[in-house]
Design a protein with these regions (language model features):
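N-terminal nucleophile
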Residues: 1-103
Length: 103
């Protein structure tokens, strides 16, 4: 299961083809890919983080700083994780961190 909450960031990125954007992936795409390809929460965290860094992450299109990042709760039957994801200062990658939640 993956749940999300939109939050603030110090950087804003735009999708490719929109306002000169260079980022390819939003949280909806990242979560869909993770749900399709991962069998564990840990694997989903690692995949989302790597894809965001490699291909760029953008928050809500047209959002100011207040909607440019996401926090994801990622849970399986064994582990729970919280992942925070935001664009980097170039608009073409991402900065992320994750913490396992004690169960």
């Amino acid at each position: 299961m993956i749940a999300e909450s939109t939050c603030s960031s110090i950087f804003v990125a735009h999708p490719k083809g929109h306002q000169g954007g260079r980022a390819l992936l939003c949280y909806q795409a990242l979560t869909r890919i993770a749900l399709e390809h991962c069998t564990t929460a840990r694997g989903a965290v690692e995949l989302i983080g790597q894809l965001a860094v490699d291909h760029g992450f953008y928050g809500n299109v047209g959002a100011a700083l207040s909607g440019s990042a996401e926090t994801l709760a990622i849970v399986d039957t064994q582990e729970a994780w919280v992942l925070h994801l935001m664009p980097d200062d170039t608009g073409s990658s991402a900065v992320w961190c994750a913490q396992q939640v004690p169960t």
